[in-house]
């Protein structure tokens, strides 16, 4: 097969910083549902669950998963739950298929960084910073 290579004028981390104003979170919507109603194909960890798998952050009380919004059932979708409860999980509906760039059962680190941008929890922000420092550009 053929391969295509992209060469950046700057190092990866510098290019990432310069691109920040042009980027947005891949998360279109966040839904809370009963974990027992989670569709079978939705297994990719996202949000704090992915951050916990990739850093020293503790697992969240509610597991978080990602799926492309176009794959989420429009009819017969699981009923949403308004507040956290025992046996619930969070499903992030993404603008694109997160599986395309996923690694080790988690969304990719750059997309994870973008999806966590509005979280104000200091321990989460420290974990995101640690994640970004460990990327080999």
Predicted regions and their residues:
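Long, low-complexity, charge-rich intrinsically disordered regions
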Residues: 17-137
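Short, cationic-aromatic polyanion-contact patches
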Residues: 2-23
């Amino acid at each position: 097969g053929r391969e295509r290579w992209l060469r950046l004028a700057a190092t990866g981390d510098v290019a990432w910083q310069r691109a920040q104003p042009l980027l947005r979170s891949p998360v279109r919507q966040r839904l809370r549902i009963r974990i027992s109603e989670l569709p079978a194909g939705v297994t990719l960890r996202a949000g704090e669950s992915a951050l916990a798998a990739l850093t020293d952050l503790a697992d969240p009380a509610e597991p978080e998963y990602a799926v492309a919004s176009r794959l989420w059932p429009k009819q017969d979708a699981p009923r949403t739950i308004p507040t956290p409860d025992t046996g619930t999980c969070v499903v992030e509906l993404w603008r694109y298929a997160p599986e395309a760039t996923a690694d080790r059962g988690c969304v990719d680190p750059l997309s994870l960084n973008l999806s966590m941008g509005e979280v104000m929890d200091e321990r989460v922000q420290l974990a995101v910073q640690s994640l970004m420092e460990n990327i080999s550009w």
